[in-house]
Regions:
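Short, small/polar residue-rich loop motifs at catalytic or cofactor-binding pockets
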Residues: 1-2, 63
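Active-site phosphate-binding/coordination module
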Residues: 19-121
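Asp-based phosphoryl-transfer active-site loop
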Residues: 3-18, 40
Length: 124
């Protein structure tokens, strides 16, 4: 019977320096070889996931604190904030002097994040 395995990233799959133990890599590869699906489940957006994690070979992810679900690179679920909600969050962060990163469904890499920061159609 095949199973679905969900792995957290920070502090579970990777230590806080971003290092993935070789034993974890081998366990994931063996699980997939045995017919199980392996997903990461993380607060990170897809663009914030280390390339080394993707290189292991995963069936995909639940990311952005549950706001997006991908299976085999296909978007299965995507919940975005309305423009009003986004503005309220951005204002709240600015009022407190907090740094933040906005990512969207189209953000697939850190380069995309940087492009979004400099060419965002919605002023922050």
């Amino acid at each position: 019977m095949s199973k679905v395995i969900f792995l957290d990233v920070d502090g579970t799959l990777c230590n806080y320096e971003g290092v993935i133990p070789e034993s974890a890599k081998q366990a994931i590869k063996q699980a997939r070889k045995n017919g199980h699906k392996v997903y990461i489940c993380t607060g990170r957006s897809r663009a914030e996931v280390y390339q080394e994690i993707w290189d292991i070979g995963l069936d995909r992810m639940i990311g952005g604190n549950g706001s997006c679900v991908e299976d085999q690179s296909k978007s299965v679920y995507h919940k975005k904030l309305s423009e009003t909600e986004e503005r309220a969050v951005v204002d709240w962060l600015h009022e407190r002097g907090l740094e933040f990163l906005k990512a969207c469904k189209e953000t697939r890499s850190f380069k995309d994040v940087m492009n979004c920061l400099f060419f965002c159609p919605y002023d922050t």
